[in-house]
Amino acid sequence: MIKEVQQNDIEKCVTVIRESFKTVADEFGLTVENASRFTAFATTKERLEWHLFGEHRPMYAYYYDGIIVGYYSLLLQDNNECELNNLCVVPAYRHKGIGEELLKDAFEMAYKLNCNKVNIGIVEENKVLRKWYEGFGFVHTGTQKFDFFPFTCGYMEIWLKKR
């Protein structure tokens, strides 16, 4: 079941995000020393509270048997676009369709928020993840290299269909 995140969910969401993105960090050799701004290391209670209360981001958690095992948020952008952030599922609950449910829910929520397009950023070198998003209709739009990351940031987008 997917529910909107409340303040009392924040700490658990931080744990879910950090645990989920840690597998990516491990796979690509990312550490707090070489990629301190990477999601697995940079997500904090204060940051998520700012997202929720400062930026008013819609944030959602996936509950499985009463515990949070997945998460995503939407950052509303100009021109009726939004950015999908931190869509994740903890490793023990992967390959059960939860990620797909979260993504489809994100599309639904973005549409309800009058977004015409959803943008995402990924670790470009993560070919499996890129292919997964492409399977849902995302199109690769470019890359950018930042000095503070040892990987390349890849960008993708999907236009939402009118209903």
Predicted segments — roles?
Residues 97:
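Conserved G/P- and acidic residue-centered "switch" motifs that form tight phosphate/ATP-binding loops
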Residues 94:
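Glycine-rich ATP-binding loop(s) of histidine-kinase-like ATPases
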Residues 4-86, 90-91, 103-105, 109, ...:
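Acetyl-CoA-dependent GNAT
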Residues 100:
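Residues forming the Rossmann-fold NAD(P)(H) cofactor-binding site
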Residues 116-130, 134-136, 143-163:
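C-terminal "cap" of GNAT-fold acetyltransferases
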